[in-house]
């Protein structure tokens, strides 16, 4: 352009890219669909896992999809019903999202069915595990099986008619049902009935374990429960002729909405909300393609749903039930048993307090055992010098040694304060039971702050010692759940750091009382300051990049959704900061876009264990700062939950976490890399071969062997 005063040429200003451009973002829901596709790929890959582990991934894919419909699709359905056409950050309206979800899911279900019927079933048969049908059995076997049906199944069934005298039967969420058309043998009248396949019984029947059937050749024969019910319908409908029978399965809206400000008793309100899940609107109706239009339309009309919510599945409905096959005792068809390392096994005494006083401890689960965490709480419960235990509980499991330790401590007259998050989705009933049990034991139980879920993972133990009161802390990235601790990757940080202890004390006071503490010296807390802190840390790396050229950010988490922080990462990339993101699930950021995100790499590791840890690494001018915690980068985590991030200071632990991150990022066997268009490509090949989870297991086993040698030498 020309300078108007002197006529000289000056360069035109380079336009700043519009970082709100929808093309720069991946749709949240479709990104989740992509994640579940990566789970499905584990089942499809015959070289990746033993046979029954592939079955497990089919089950996980299916149960994931069910939950997605119960929550996310249900929400989109609500928006469509309310006439909401607001576009998401990527430019899609709710109805457009539903259309794309349906298209993607139908393709995935076809893949899943082809995998199960054309690949896995024949492979199972070759290994001596075979699904059979009732009709394939001999007449004598069918008669014996009929006796089994009368004794074990018939008493649980409830046939329900539908006509002018019988209202359309209620059908609960996730229920598998049989739609039956009947003819009255006396009047010739055509009737309709429904039979629910009882969820209280095993969905898969082991015929080889039923006495008298003659299956004693060592092979395992399996039968679907619905097949047995269908072949014995004449016992449920005497003097009726069975014209046709078709299975169907429904999924309902399961999202609970509680107006906490109006709820007089939160626990009671949550209980009512859990019960209401049974009555949520139908968001998916699974049928087989051969269901006639007459029955299909009858179901759609009376379930008050839409044709767009009907999915012709084909084959077996409700494949999450395949998890039952993992009960089969065939170690040759499963992953080799892995027993984690317990770093305290080499100690003469099991005094965890003494270990923590000697230095901070970092456990990397499941490669390191969760047992030291459980032992810490039990030791505190039994120790007469321990005065109080405070803990947050989100998902703890149905038979929790952690909660039992807290109950024991309360019974010993220790001050026990527990925040039980009643709103932990699909764990509400379990948490309600534990909350009542803790109260009965004498613990102080609170349910958190109104309008906020408490997702932070914190334990604080106060102990009287010669020098005065000392605080022992456990801070984690995962739940206090001994079952998931064996299959989720997480970190546990055990410390007596006094500054961190002061912060945790203040946070517990905020959670259990009316404290309005606003400043923390070490802890990062949402919704108070976490969003601001992450933005500041990203800006600091931009400054380091400008001055020293060594700006680097590594983040590991389950999901990256927040638009404001994605824009900040884009700006950091534009400034030259190298950014590595290990995001297992949803990622709305697009890497590798020239001029915008070319310095960002996104990978997703899907393997034997579920990647669950949250790690935030900032190079900080080669003086690395590492924070661990409970928060993903999603609006809900930053604005609507109580989350914590905590610093790891001790150099040896910082180096350990850095090493873990580099190993995860170098994975070229179980890792997927996101492309600039938002799609993923499996990282395969490359030398040396790096399967990060397998290498973490090997490292754990080496440490275990070293501990055994050390113990022998004591």
Swiss-Prot record:
Binding residues annotated for Mg(2+), in chain numbering: 395, 425
Active site residues per record: 455
Record InterPro entries: PP_kinase, PP_kinase_C_1, PP_kinase_middle, PP_kinase_middle_dom_sf, PPK_C_dom2, PPK_N_dom, PPK_N_dom_sf
PTM entry text: An intermediate of this reaction is the autophosphorylated ppk in which a phosphate is covalently linked to a histidine residue through a N-P bond.
Residues annotated as binding ATP: 64, 488, 584, 612
Any one GO CC term of the record: polyphosphate kinase complex
GO process terms (BP): polyphosphate biosynthetic process
Cofactors demanded by this protein: Mg(2+)
GO MF: ATP binding; metal ion binding; polyphosphate kinase activity
Reactions that this protein is recorded to catalyse: [phosphate](n) + ATP = [phosphate](n+1) + ADP
Enzyme class: transferase
Keyword field contains Disulfide bond: no
EC number: 2.7.4.1
Similarity comment: Belongs to the polyphosphate kinase 1 (PPK1) family.
Function, in words: Catalyzes the reversible transfer of the terminal phosphate of ATP to form a long-chain polyphosphate (polyP).
PANTHER family in the record: POLYPHOSPHATE KINASE (PTHR30218:SF0)
NCBIfam families xref list: poly_P_kin, PRK05443.1-1, PRK05443.1-2, PRK05443.2-2
Designated name of the protein: Polyphosphate kinase 2
Organism: Chlorobaculum tepidum (strain ATCC 49652 / DSM 12025 / NBRC 103806 / TLS)
